[in-house]
């Protein structure tokens, strides 16, 4: 799977309704994207059929980047105006999530493979 730009990944995530309790589609998308980019992904079961997403390159990371997948209602999709991304979760925390994925990929490409990602549900 080809890498998405930071903006495209953030926008793809913002366009998925992941208000608290409805994170399944966003988690599935994120897990598939990360697998397609060569990460070893574990979907960690949580209550109510929900999952956290753990993605590793090395089984013993020295750094783990983490944030949450869920956001508060109501859902509304993304828009980009004057170079700025708007939409539910763009700032809290899907933009940060996309930035963490992008950072992990760049670290891996530079030879620093000991980075992990942990994205959790139910923070809101």
Model-derived segments and their meaning:
Residues 94, 98-124:
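Acidic/histidine-rich catalytic neighborhood of metal-dependent amide-processing enzymes
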Residues 1-90, 108-112:
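Acidic/His- and Gly-rich active-site-bordering loop/insert found
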């Amino acid at each position: 799977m080809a890498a998405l730009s930071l903006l495209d990944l953030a926008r793809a995530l913002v366009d998925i309704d992941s208000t608290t309790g409805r994170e399944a589609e966003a988690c599935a998308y994120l897990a598939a994207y990360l697998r397609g980019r060569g990460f070893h992904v574990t979907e960690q079961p949580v209550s109510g059929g929900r999952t956290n997403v753990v993605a590793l390159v090395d089984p013993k990371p020295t750094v783990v980047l983490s944030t949450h997948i869920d956001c508060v209602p109501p859902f509304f999709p993304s828009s980009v105006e004057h170079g700025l991304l708007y939409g539910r979760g763009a700032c809290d925390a899907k933009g940060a999530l996309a930035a963490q994925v992008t950072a992990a990929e760049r670290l891996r490409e530079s030879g620093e493979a000991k980075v992990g990602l942990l994205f959790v549900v139910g923070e809101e």
